[in-house]
């Protein structure tokens, strides 16, 4: 019985630490990180790939093992704490088509509920920078 109590205490400590002690090197915690993304418009002939700062990484979460009368708890995602917006101009757009593509730039990140106003909460994409049109690479300063 004493061994069971020791294991329970160890499990609780790991959960309180968000599992970061055991998985710190395998799963980077939520933080700003550089990523290459794509911008394109149906009306413009060129896709532009650019590097910006996004929020990415591991957020601790828990799933109830036993059925409960309570609703499931919220699952946290790595999302923007502070952000700014930047814009690029898509080249070659015909007159009357807005060539400006705006996107969020992560200044700081935190684990929280997903806000669809400025986040894609669908999980990681295999190739988020994939263009369907000919593309140019843009280097932002």
Curated annotation (Swiss-Prot):
Residues 1-22 form the signal peptide. Disulfide bonds join 30-78, 44-93, 47-131, 55-109, 59-111, 114-121. Coiled coil: none annotated. Transmembrane segments: none annotated. Glycans are attached at residue 34. GO terms for biological process: G protein-coupled receptor signaling pathway. Keywords: Disulfide bond, Glycoprotein, Hormone, Secreted, Signal. Promotes spermatogenesis and ovulation by stimulating the testes and ovaries to synthesize steroids. Belongs to the glycoprotein hormones subunit beta family. This is Lutropin subunit beta. The gene is LHB.
């Amino acid at each position: 019985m004493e061994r069971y109590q020791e294991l329970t205490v160890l499990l609780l400590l790991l959960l309180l630490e968000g599992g970061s002690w055991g998985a710190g090197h395998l799963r980077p915690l939520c933080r700003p990180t550089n990523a290459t993304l794509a911008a394109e418009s149906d009306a413009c002939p060129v896709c532009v790939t650019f590097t910006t700062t996004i929020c990415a990484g591991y957020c601790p979460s828990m799933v109830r093992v036993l059925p409960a009368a309570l609703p499931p708890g919220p699952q946290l995602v790595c999302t923007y704490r502070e952000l700014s917006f930047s814009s690029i101009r898509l080249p070659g757009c015909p007159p009357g088509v807005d060539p400006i593509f705006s996107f969020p730039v992560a200044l700081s990140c935190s684990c929280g509920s997903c806000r669809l106003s400025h986040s894609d909460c669908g999980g990681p994409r295999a190739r988020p920078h994939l263009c369907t049109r000919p593309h140019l690479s843009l280097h932002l300063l």
